[in-house]
Regions:
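Conserved active-site segments centered on acidic
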Residues: 1-66, 131-135
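Phosphate-binding/catalytic loops
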Residues: 63, 69, 75-136
Length: 136
């Protein structure tokens, strides 16, 4: 959801030429799968466009050099990411909610089914990242 929420916010601000936004998984469980149906429903309910062609891919060590920021939704994702990218000398890796000043993980809908709570957390994090003072 975060990829599409951030793309929508960037587009609304007319900044799409300044950002390249892409999501990737830290595990291999969903590789090749489309956006999860409840996530699509949540995005649709909020008018956030998404691609039916999007397929999950796993993050790679090369992504560290490709991207300015790598954002994890929760501490578990961060631990898994550290197995793929063990070092962060440039300080690129952050937790989503750290941008909001709230010291907790994004609500995980995988276990709760509460995609609305996840959407609101991700929206808050994405909006905070676009603020001029968004360096964590």
């Amino acid at each position: 959801m975060a990829e599409f929420i951030q793309k929508a916010l960037v587009r609304a601000k007319g900044l799409e030429n300044q950002y390249y936004i892409e999501s990737a998984a830290v595990s291999s469980e969903e590789i090749g799968n489309p956006v999860y149906p409840p996530a699509r429903r949540s995005l649709s309910q909020h008018g956030v466009p998404f691609s039916n062609d999007k397929r999950a891919r796993q993050v790679t060590h090369a992504d560290y050099d490709r991207f300015d920021r790598i954002i994890c939704m929760d501490a578990s994702n961060l631990r898994w990411l550290r197995r793929i990218i063990p070092r962060d000398p440039e300080g690129k890796i952050h937790l989503m909610m750290s941008y909001t000043g709230i010291g907790r993980d994004v609500a995980d809908p995988w276990y709760t089914g509460d995609f609305e709570a996840a959407f609101q957390d991700i929206l808050a994090g994405c909006e905070a990242m676009l603020r001029p003072s968004s360096h964590v």
